[in-house]
Amino acid sequence: MFKIICVTDRKLCDEDFLTRIEKIASAKPDRIIFRDKNCNDEEYVKSALKILAISDIYHVPCSMYFHTEIFSDIHMTMPMLQHICLSDINFQHFVGVSVHSVDEAIQAEQQGVDYIIAGHIFETSCKPDLAPRGLEFLKQVCESIKIPVYAIGGINANNINQIVQTGADGACIMSGFMTCKSPVAYISQLRKAVTEK
């Protein structure tokens, strides 16, 4: 089944962040990835524990950035992966990595990660100065590895079906989840768009 994943960005949220997280969790995305580049480690862990408590209530898997000593479901950047050995991490960890090239995707799979996020695919306000890598790049990534590939970058209800057509296993969405009026209605719209021919 094609997965819809929420990636957080506190800066985009115009209401209490944890209130927004609860609304998103109640809408049942396939996963929430807690991303916050604007806080220190201590603040991140405190927020992460609160978010994990919310996601557990709604039975939504939640990935945290790194902090392998605390969390078992983690996401990391490629530079982070290159500085650790996954075999040294508890085998119970579920690990995802963000990649920006086919070579990185292959390397991540060889190092034993469970999934990758590839991007950015379409133009996005999050990376205004970087050209999108496009659908052909995403298709090449999907054809190069066997683990799940999730796309990210500028994805919405109007283009998510193009992501499906590349063979990707899911889509990660940030601004849509952070700014929509109703996460329940928003995710329903996305799931409907996924199945359109």
Show where each model-derived region lies.
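Glycine-rich phosphate-binding active-site loops on the catalytic face of alpha/beta enzymes
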Residues: C6, I74, M78-D88, I117-D129, ...
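N-terminal active-site wall of soluble small-molecule enzyme domains
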Residues: R31-I89
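Alpha-helix-loop-beta-strand connector modules within alpha/beta enzyme cores
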Residues: S47-F66, S87-S101, D129-A157, L190-K197
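Structural motif
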Residues: I24-A27, Q111, S144, Q165-G167
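Short, acidic/polar
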Residues: K11-A25, H67-T68, H100-Q107, N156-N161
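Glycine/Thr-rich beta-alpha phosphate-binding loop at enzyme active sites
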Residues: D73-M80, G96-E143
